[in-house]
Design a protein with these regions (language model features):
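DNA polymerase processivity clamps
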Residues: 2-254
Length: 254
């Protein structure tokens, strides 16, 4: 338990939760920057028995991560009890933004907060990382049902995506120290899954992304004329034609 004096009010910090700083910074790349959707201007932290989840979205992309519970900076043994059952917290982006990662930075930041009272007042938060402490209050709002966005069935049908969204996942991979190229699992005009965080990137952590496809507008649905450059027109291959061509290529290579 941590007691914090703040002006005329004394805050009793009942929970101290260790959050992987790199996972937190990576997930935060998906938050919105618009004031009108202030409830999305932060990372939603949820507490379960043996893990926590982190979620951020701006309505066009989503990044979600899971981290197994760790205890590296407890003031008292078992002081946090994992915070299972506590209401989720929207951790403000301006607190996360001030975390600066370096090669010698610690792995974890400590999120301290008090229990949610009956008065439903915003909880006072502290985010400690590498000898710095950020203080503030949780975002007072209900976070959207983000789990409904993540698809559980993928068609493989191709779609177009805003390049800026794809860049976000590349940045997230870099934050967690991965050199792997993010892969979009196309799902037609439905939300697509994105693999960007290899399982061995962060110990005890898993993460994925969701990208919303663009609705193609204009006259670019058809293949562009290329005969003037290549000497022949481009044609679409049917799945069967592509399969046969790939089979023959592999046979020739064997």
């Amino acid at each position: 338990m941590v007691v914090v004096e703040n002006r005329a009010r004394c805050y009793i910090m009942q929970y101290n939760i260790e959050i992987n700083a790199r996972l937190l910074k990576a997930v935060a790349l998906a938050v919105t920057k618009t004031e009108t959707r202030y409830y999305l201007n932060g990372v939603y932290v949820e507490f379960f028995g043996d893990y926590i989840t982190l979620t951020a979205t701006d309505g066009h992309k989503l990044i979600a991560g899971r981290q197994m519970r760790v205890f590296t900076n407890q003031s008292e043994p078992g002081a946090s009890d994992g915070a299972a059952g506590q209401a989720g917290i929207i951790l403000p982006f301006d607190m996360i933004e001030k975390i600066k990662l370096g090669k010698k930075s610690p792995d974890y930041a400590t999120l301290s907060f008090d229990a949610k009272g009956d008065n439903l007042a915003a909880r006072f938060l502290q985010l400690r990382f590498d000898a710095t402490t950020q203080s503030g209050f949780e975002v007072e709002a209900s976070y959207p049902a983000a789990r409904r966005v993540a698809p559980v069935s993928i068609t493989g049908e191709t779609a177009a995506f805003d390049p800026e969204i794809l860049i976000t996942f590349s940045k997230a991979a870099k934050v967690v120290g991965s050199l792997a190229t993010p892969v979009v699992h196309h799902n037609g005009l439905n939300p697509a899954l994105v693999s960007w965080c290899p399982a061995d990137s962060l110990p005890g952590c898993l993460a994925f992304g969701v990208a919303m496809p663009l609705r193609v507008q204009g006259d670019f649905q058809e293949l562009p004329p290329v005969a003037w450059f290549t000497g022949q027109s481009a044609v679409r291959s049917t799945p069967e034609d592509k399969f046969k061509a790939e089979t023959e290529r592999l046979k020739a290579k064997a």
